[in-house]
């Protein structure tokens, strides 16, 4: 469930495969789920390359990964595959946070990975012109401040101080946004594509559930009947 929720929001993904062990059964599951929920682009990182002495073994794992990706209709031969060691890169940077990547091959490979992400995964077009809409994924309370709803802004934009509607499951309510936060940074404005926490005035935690939405007042209407496309996954 959590894998699907996260993957459904992605503009791209890094598939991590052990260079020492090759693709595991769950690797295929993750690729299948990514394809089914519409993750458009994948970059591959072959981890634990430090544990593989024979370069040909890494090449065999790379070929196996390419075949697996192609099996699920990703362009396996075009997808960037970078080998490295996350552990050795982390240890090097922990020991010397100011380390120049050029002086450590494992750190350099992580930078190469991120460059590949920037180059291969296209910058997504955000739907910023339509009315604000965010599906609520989680909710929690901050003592002395109020209730926070978290989720990904699907479309539009929203500012601190703006009035929004809480819609779905229960009676529609209006509330005012008193705070926006993303990755522990306070924002004045949030736009489509942001994963944010929204602090709401006058709303109790019990009034919000996952599956409800925050929206510009009057922009959406809840329905009891709808058509949906469902993927049934089997083992």
UniProtKB/Swiss-Prot annotation:
One Pfam family of this chain: GTP_EFTU
GO molecular function: GTP binding; GTPase activity; translation elongation factor activity
Catalysed reactions, semicolon-separated: GTP + H2O = GDP + phosphate + H(+)
Key words, A-Z: Chloroplast, Elongation factor, GTP-binding, Hydrolase, Nucleotide-binding, Plastid, Protein biosynthesis
Top-rank lineage group of the source organism: Eukaryota
Family matches, as PROSITE patterns: G_TR_2
CDD domains with a match to the protein in the record: EFTU_II
EC number, UniProt record: 3.6.5.3
GO cellular component: chloroplast; mitochondrion
InterPro entries: EF-Tu_GTPase, EFTu-like_2, EFTU_2, P-loop_NTPase, T_Tr_GTP-bd_dom, Transl_B-barrel_sf
UniProt keyword annotation of Chloroplast present: yes
Localization: Plastid, Chloroplast
Residue positions binding GTP: 47-50
Every tr-type G domain range: 1-125
Predominant location: plastid
GO biological process, one term: mitochondrial translational elongation
Protein purpose: GTP hydrolase that promotes the GTP-dependent binding of aminoacyl-tRNA to the A-site of ribosomes during protein biosynthesis.
UniProt record similarity statement: Belongs to the TRAFAC class translation factor GTPase superfamily. Classic translation factor GTPase family. EF-Tu/EF-1A subfamily.
Protein name as catalogued: Elongation factor Tu, chloroplastic
Origin species: Derbesia marina
